[in-house]
Amino acid sequence: SNYIAKVSMMDMNMRPGENNPGRTYKWYNGSAVYEFGHGLHYTNFSANITTQMQNSYAISALTQNCNSTGGFLERCPFAAVDVEVSNDGDVTSDYVALGYIAGEFGPAPHPKKSLVSYKRLHNITGGASDTATLNLTLASLARVDEMGNKVLYPGDYTLLIDNHPLASINFTLTGEQAMLDMWPQ
């Protein structure tokens, strides 16, 4: 890859810019040698999201119903998403369920995806299944603006399971954006 020739070591911007193709799996649009979260198994897995989620959520309701976190909105629970993982091969293996959020919400440029939760399942035998619960908070859905504030934006979201992905589910956040955490200025 010629990535190292494209980015100055002095440029610390994560987001893509005029002379920067973007850093990390969230922003880089080129072809990676190994994608973030890449792993090899001696078997094949399939996944199915078994949690029934709403199609739409009002941001005001999500933030108003959060009383259990001592006023820290970013810690508010959003959803506990159950993912049934099946070992479709013959070899016993562990599996790490990676939950990413993707979508074009908030100001451009938009990250390709963001890792928001993961869970390792141990020793899934061939032909067997196990369930991973991915716990999402409002911070899982938020983006950090240029001032360092965590903001929950309205828009269309997709929860992706694994890199390919093996499963996905879509939902929409509606209403006005909400500041979850303000960075000291």
Regions found by a protein language model. Give the residues of each.
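Intrinsically disordered, low-complexity Pro/Gly/Ser/Thr-rich segments with frequent PxxP/GP/PP motifs
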Residues: P107-V144
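A broad, low-specificity signal marking well-ordered, structured residues that form hydrophobic/aromatic
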Residues: F45, A97, V116
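Residue-level recognition of conserved beta-strand edge/terminus positions
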Residues: D82, Y100-A102, T133, L160
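Secreted, periplasmic, or luminal enzymes acting at the cell surface/secretory milieu
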Residues: S1-D94, N149, P154-D162, F171-Q185
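Residue-level signal for secondary-structure boundary sites
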Residues: N55, V91, P107, A142-V144, ...
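Beta-strand elements of well-folded, non-transmembrane domains
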Residues: N87-G89, G103-F105, L138-S140, N163-P165
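Short acidic, flexible loop segments centered on an aromatic residue
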Residues: D90-A108, K113
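Intrinsic-disorder/low-complexity, polar/charged segments enriched in Ser/Thr/Lys/Arg/Asp/Glu/Gln
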Residues: F78-D82, S129-T133, L166-S168
